C-alpha cells in the first residue's frame, strides 16, 4: 500500500542507523512578492545509509530543485538539509567544492566525460583532484570498473565507447571516492532499454554489495522498480511513498504504475 503523508513529508523513522540525508521542512521560492513561485513547499524526507531510493513526480513538482539544494548547487529559502551529519547551509563557500567531492557522487543523464581522457583517467579524476596517492588511485579505479563491468574499456576514450559504456564509466567515477550519497539525475534518460537495464542492474548490485546510498531522480517506472523505496512528489512536497519490502521487481513495478496512474502521470520534463 502507498502511504499518503498527512503533512506532505516522508516518514522520518527509516531505520536505526544514522541518516545520510535529512531534509527538514525545506522551502524554495523564486520571484518577487507579485509573482512568487514555490518550487519546494515544506519538503521533508530522510534517507538512511545503504538505501536505494527513487524520486518521481510530474513536471514542475520540485525534483530538480531538491536535487540542486542537496548538492549545494542551490540554497533553500528556509528549512534544513543535513548531509552526513553536516548542515549544508553552514558550509563556507571556500569549502563547498571539497565537500561535494568528498561526500557526494554525481551521475547525470549525459555522462559528462572529458573527451581528452581515457575511461581510466575519467574515473580517477576526483581522486587525482583530491591528491590521493597514485597506487591507491589505480587500485580504486580498477575496483570501481570491476563493480560496473567495464574493465575492458579502461584504456579507451569516450568516442570509442558505446553510450551505455560511457554512462557506466560515469557511474564508476561517481562511486570511486566511496561517497556518502550518490545523486543520480535521470541516469538512464539517454540510454536504450538494454543499456539502461545494464546500468540499473549495476547500481542495484553496488547498492547491495557495497552498501552505496543512492538517490535517483527518474520519470521511468521501470528504473524506479530497481529501487527499494520510491518517493512521489507533487507541488514541492512528498505526498506518497512506496516501500518495496519483499516484493519482486515486477510486483513493485505494478504498484508504482498504480500510483503514477492516480497521480496523473509522470513525464520526463522537469
Language-model features: where?
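Pre-NBD coupling/linker segments of ABC/ABC-like ATPases
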Residues: 2-16
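Glycine-rich, flexible loop segments associated with nucleotide phosphate handling
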Residues: 17, 36-41, 251-260
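ABC family nucleotide-binding domain
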Residues: 19-233, 238
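Conserved beta-strand-loop-alpha-helix hinge in the C-terminal portion
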Residues: 237-261
Amino acid at each position: 500500500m502507498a502511504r499518503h503523508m498527512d503533512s506532505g513529508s516522508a516518514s522520518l523513522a527509516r531505520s536505526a542507523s544514522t541518516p545520510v540525508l535529512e531534509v527538514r521542512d525545506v522551502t524554495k521560492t523564486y520571484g518577487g512578492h507579485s509573482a512568487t513561485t514555490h518550487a519546494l513547499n515544506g519538503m521533508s524526507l530522510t534517507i538512511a545509509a545503504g538505501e536505494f531510493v527513487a524520486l518521481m513526480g510530474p513536471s514542475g513538482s520540485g525534483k530538480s530543485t531538491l536535487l540542486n539544494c542537496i548538492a549545494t548547487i542551490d540554497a533553500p529559502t528556509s528549512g534544513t538539509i543535513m548531509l552526513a551529519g553536516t548542515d549544508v547551509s553552514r558550509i563556507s563557500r571556500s569549502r563547498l567544492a571539497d565537500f561535494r567531492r568528498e561526500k557526494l557522487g554525481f551521475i547525470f543523464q549525459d555522462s559528462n566525460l572529458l573527451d581528452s581522457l581515457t575511461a581510466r583517467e575519467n574515473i580517477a579524476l576526483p581522486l587525482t583532484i583530491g591528491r590521493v596517492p597514485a597506487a591507491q588511485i589505480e587500485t580504486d579505479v580498477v575496483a570501481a570498473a570491476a563493480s560496473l563491468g567495464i574493465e575492458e574499456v579502461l584504456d579507451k576514450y569516450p568516442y570509442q565507447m558505446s553510450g551505455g559504456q560511457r554512462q557506466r564509466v560515469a557511474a564508476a567515477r561517481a562511486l570511486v571516492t566511496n561517497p556518502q550519497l550518490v545523486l543520480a539525475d535521470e541516469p538512464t534518460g539517454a540510454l536504450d532499454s538494454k543499456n539502461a537495464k545494464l546500468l540499473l542492474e549495476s547500481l542495484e548490485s553496488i547498492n547491495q554489495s557495497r552498501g552505496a546510498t543512492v538517490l535517483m531522480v527518474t520519470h521511468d517506472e521501470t528504473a524506479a522498480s530497481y529501487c527499494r523505496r520510491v518517493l512521489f512528489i507533487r507541488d514541492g512536497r512528498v505526498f506518497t511513498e512506496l516501500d518495496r519490502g519483499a516484493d519482486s521487481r515486477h510486483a513493485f513495478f505494478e504498484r508504482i504504475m498504480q500510483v503514477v496512474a492516480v497521480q496523473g502521470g509522470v513525464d520526463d520534463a522537469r
